[in-house]
Regions:
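Conserved functional micro-motifs across diverse proteins
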Residues: 13-141
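Sec-dependent N-terminal signal peptides
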Residues: 2-14
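Compositionally biased, low-complexity segments enriched in small residues
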Residues: 1-2, 117
Length: 141
């Protein structure tokens, strides 16, 4: 599982290891739990709400579905957030139709973010605002 928090970011920086340059989601702990491939994907917002639209891939494409578990601390202040995006091994950016919305006091929630990608695309990075999470360990499976 990949996690990012302010304390974790500071520990990595202090150890001299590469990490994201800033913490874009103060008070919100996010853990990538899996990356899957699918021919269809739900376009629900995060946390899941009433949007029940399902997308279907076109020939030569698939959905890379990234699941993220979120945990909001008392320091979390809801604000408009950008949509997550992913990068592949060539540095090409893929966006999702799903957005992160105000969790309305829900302290823990899990969301899936579908990304329409060409068949065989290997993802390297998940980006939420200016925070980056390495996905290469999920793609090695």
């Amino acid at each position: 599982m990949m996690r990012f928090t302010i304390a974790g970011l500071l520990a990595v920086l202090a150890a001299g290891q590469p990490a994201s340059t800033s913490q874009a989601l103060p008070g919100l702990d996010a853990t990538v739990t899996k990356v899957e491939r699918a021919p269809t994907a739900s376009l629900r917002d995060c946390p899941p709400g009433t949007n029940t639209v399902t997308a279907v891939s076109r020939p030569g494409e698939q959905f890379a579905v990234v699941t993220i578990a979120f945990k909001a601390s008392a320091a979390f202040k809801p604000s408009p957030m950008l949509r997550p995006s992913v990068l592949d091994t060539a540095g090409k950016k893929f966006n999702t139709a799903s957005t992160i919305v105000d969790p309305a006091g829900v302290p823990e929630f899990s969301c899936t973010f579908p990304f329409r990608v060409p068949d065989g695309t290997k993802l390297t990075t998940l980006q939420i605002a200016t925070t980056s999470i390495d996905l290469s360990s999920f793609e090695a499976k």
